[in-house]
Amino acid sequence: MKNITSSSTCSTGLLQLQNNLSCSELEVAEKTEQQAVGPGTIPSPWTPVNAGPPGALGSADTNGSMVDSKNLDVGDMSDDEKDLSSADAEGVWSPDIEQSFQEALSIYPPCGRRKIILSDEGKMYGRNELIARYIKLRTGKTRTRKQVSSHIQVLARRKLREIQAKIKVQFWQPGLQPSTSQDFYDYSIKPFPQPPYPAGKTSTAVSGDETGIPPSQLPWEGRAIATHKFRLLEFTAFMEIQRDEIYHRHLFVQLGGKPSFSDPLLETVDIRQIFDKFPEKSGGLKDLYEKGPQNAFYLVKCWADLNTDLTTGSETGDFYGVTSQYESNENVVLVCSTIVCSFGKQVVEKVESEYSRLENNRYVYRIQRSPMCEYMINFIQKLKNLPERYMMNSVLENFTILQVMRARETQETLLCIAYVFEVAAQNSGTTHHIYRLIKE
């Protein structure tokens, strides 16, 4: 079973950000370093030290620890170096050192665990060693790669705290904030941690209302969002844009596909770990699960694709919508409820009804191009305007969606899907992972 534990948004968000950056500026950086002037004559395009770190520091770089010390110009401290003056002691960064440090961050972008070869020397360096080397050349003062790594982490944590504080106060501004809910934001509610789910055991296939029944011969049972009587065929959240007679369609989230017997069975997550991420009132996730059927509950972790450079907005006539499709072996009137939640509280709810169409001896339900509400459009646009991916993920820690499909006449829950989100990496497209919710 999956075990969700709290983890540092700083470490996951920043390391993900680091791995997406490239070393394309290294050759230019080398030339810039060779043209460096001596101490005291450095022109500064950076903000002063007391103004705080710049907006994009990158993440703590671990590549320094992987480099052979024989190739270092600036390595670990020797005994003589430990006798440096207090102004140069570890943790003390004078303005000239800080300025050179910030310049080096810009010159040498994060490169993961790769090493960099300087063509004039033929030596291999990690990023932290290059930063330490740059500081030495510019200021004449020594900083080791370990001190550089520690300083990067300190500044990154400080920056993340500042961002999270601003998000609480500034992100949820009028225009996003619903007028119908007074408990939309509660400072006593802890943010929703979004750690990656560690590997857990797989579930057994379910073919009845309770577990323990032998597996069905249908390939989707136990491998997709489905029960023996009802299943999700497709779910797509998208925007459509038309510019100069050119039509664009961008997918934020997409679920679907045809499962086969070769697909692995779904892994499980204890539903109690996410109860506080969704409304607790009557009709909330906990209440629904207790009423059952318990084989109808699923968790979907979505990596939403926000990587589009197209300028959008409701005022330009762009369309934001959702298309979903379901299949049943019973003819019922389907009621689909979609609840958007923030900090575990309901923000808005949309309820739609759909009648079936008989196709290939199955009853099919299609909810086509259902428009997103103004709240969701504003939320996506504000999220896209955040400058860094880890900032977006920090916001999404507190954002969830609960979707409940019921039969109108009996009010039986046919499917209940809990969605949590992160932002997809650059150029990776949208992906997702499905878990079956259980209670042990």
UniProtKB/Swiss-Prot annotation:
<keyword id="KW-0010">Activator</keyword>
<keyword id="KW-0217">Developmental protein</keyword>
<keyword id="KW-0131">Cell cycle</keyword>
<keyword id="KW-0479">Metal-binding</keyword>
<dbReference type="GO" id="GO:0001222">
    <property type="term" value="F:transcription corepressor binding"/>
</dbReference>
<dbReference type="GO" id="GO:0006357">
    <property type="term" value="P:regulation of transcription by RNA polymerase II"/>
</dbReference>
<feature type="DNA-binding region" description="TEA">
    <location>
        <begin position="86"/>
        <end position="162"/>
    </location>
</feature>
<dbReference type="InterPro" id="IPR016361">
    <property type="entry name" value="TEF_metazoa"/>
</dbReference>
<dbReference type="GO" id="GO:0035329">
    <property type="term" value="P:hippo signaling"/>
</dbReference>
<dbReference type="GO" id="GO:0005667">
    <property type="term" value="C:transcription regulator complex"/>
</dbReference>
<dbReference type="GO" id="GO:0007423">
    <property type="term" value="P:sensory organ development"/>
</dbReference>
<dbReference type="GO" id="GO:0008270">
    <property type="term" value="F:zinc ion binding"/>
</dbReference>
<keyword id="KW-0862">Zinc</keyword>
<dbReference type="InterPro" id="IPR038096">
    <property type="entry name" value="TEA/ATTS_sf"/>
</dbReference>
<dbReference type="InterPro" id="IPR050937">
    <property type="entry name" value="TEC1_TEAD_TF"/>
</dbReference>
<comment type="subunit">
    <text>The C-terminus of sd interacts with the C-terminal serine-rich protein domain of vg, to form a complex which acts as a selector for wing development. Interacts (via C-terminus) with yki (via N-terminus) and this interaction enhances its transcriptional activity.</text>
</comment>
<dbReference type="GO" id="GO:0007480">
    <property type="term" value="P:imaginal disc-derived leg morphogenesis"/>
</dbReference>
<dbReference type="GO" id="GO:0055013">
    <property type="term" value="P:cardiac muscle cell development"/>
</dbReference>
<dbReference type="Pfam" id="PF17725">
    <property type="entry name" value="YBD"/>
</dbReference>
<dbReference type="GO" id="GO:0048568">
    <property type="term" value="P:embryonic organ development"/>
</dbReference>
<dbReference type="GO" id="GO:0001745">
    <property type="term" value="P:compound eye morphogenesis"/>
</dbReference>
<dbReference type="GO" id="GO:0019904">
    <property type="term" value="F:protein domain specific binding"/>
</dbReference>
<dbReference type="GO" id="GO:0045944">
    <property type="term" value="P:positive regulation of transcription by RNA polymerase II"/>
</dbReference>
<keyword id="KW-0539">Nucleus</keyword>
<dbReference type="InterPro" id="IPR041086">
    <property type="entry name" value="YBD"/>
</dbReference>
<dbReference type="GO" id="GO:0090575">
    <property type="term" value="C:RNA polymerase II transcription regulator complex"/>
</dbReference>
<dbReference type="GO" id="GO:0005654">
    <property type="term" value="C:nucleoplasm"/>
</dbReference>
<dbReference type="GO" id="GO:0035220">
    <property type="term" value="P:wing disc development"/>
</dbReference>
<keyword id="KW-0804">Transcription</keyword>
<keyword id="KW-0221">Differentiation</keyword>
<dbReference type="GO" id="GO:0045892">
    <property type="term" value="P:negative regulation of DNA-templated transcription"/>
</dbReference>
<dbReference type="GO" id="GO:0000981">
    <property type="term" value="F:DNA-binding transcription factor activity, RNA polymerase II-specific"/>
</dbReference>
<keyword id="KW-0863">Zinc-finger</keyword>
<dbReference type="InterPro" id="IPR000818">
    <property type="entry name" value="TEA/ATTS_dom"/>
</dbReference>
<dbReference type="GO" id="GO:0072089">
    <property type="term" value="P:stem cell proliferation"/>
</dbReference>
<dbReference type="GO" id="GO:0000978">
    <property type="term" value="F:RNA polymerase II cis-regulatory region sequence-specific DNA binding"/>
</dbReference>
<dbReference type="GO" id="GO:0000976">
    <property type="term" value="F:transcription cis-regulatory region binding"/>
</dbReference>
<dbReference type="GO" id="GO:2000826">
    <property type="term" value="P:regulation of heart morphogenesis"/>
</dbReference>
<dbReference type="GO" id="GO:0001223">
    <property type="term" value="F:transcription coactivator binding"/>
</dbReference>
<keyword id="KW-0238">DNA-binding</keyword>
<protein>
    <recommendedName>
        <fullName>Protein scalloped</fullName>
    </recommendedName>
</protein>
<dbReference type="GO" id="GO:0007406">
    <property type="term" value="P:negative regulation of neuroblast proliferation"/>
</dbReference>
